[in-house]
Amino acid sequence: MPPKKDAKSSAKQPQKTQKKKEGSGGGKAKKKKWSKGKVRDKLNNQVLFDKATYEKLYKEVPAYKLITPSVVSERLKIRGSLAKRALIELREKGLIKQVVQHHSQVIYTRATKGDEA
């Protein structure tokens, strides 16, 4: 009698394992890892003008086609607030012309010779 029991139990076990294999298709997936994220460089922009940057402002900025505080800040490596004040000063002196005034962004362009007259 014992050999018959072994045969039945061994016959049942393969069926159980087969069912487990079929059902495990939609089981646990690998856990997603967190990405490190992008690291930005620290901007070390000037807070005040030095003589060289101030001269560069008067020489180069009026020649730009599109002048915004962000463009000036990036090219001259100065803070955005300083760039805003510098552009207001250039506008008052007539070196650049204001195109659009938005509540958060001001756009200027170079003053053409026809505008100065």
UniProtKB/Swiss-Prot annotation:
Q: Domain of life, per the record?
A: Eukaryota
Alphabetized InterPro entries for the sequence: Ribosomal_eS25 (IPR004977)
Q: Could you give a single Gene Ontology term from the biological process aspect?
A: cytoplasmic translation
UniProtKB keywords: Ribonucleoprotein, Ribosomal protein
A single GO CC term for this protein reads:
cytosolic ribosome
- KW Transmembrane helix (keyword) present: no
Cite the residue spans of the region called Disordered: 1-38
Question: Which spans does this entry mark as compositional bias, Basic residues?
Answer: 28-37
Which Gene3D superfamilies does the entry mention? Answer: 3.30.63.20
* GO terms of molecular function: structural constituent of ribosome
Which family is this sequence assigned to?
Belongs to the eukaryotic ribosomal protein eS25 family.
Q: What is this protein called?
A: Small ribosomal subunit protein eS25
Name the lineage: Eukaryota, Metazoa, Ecdysozoa, Arthropoda, Hexapoda
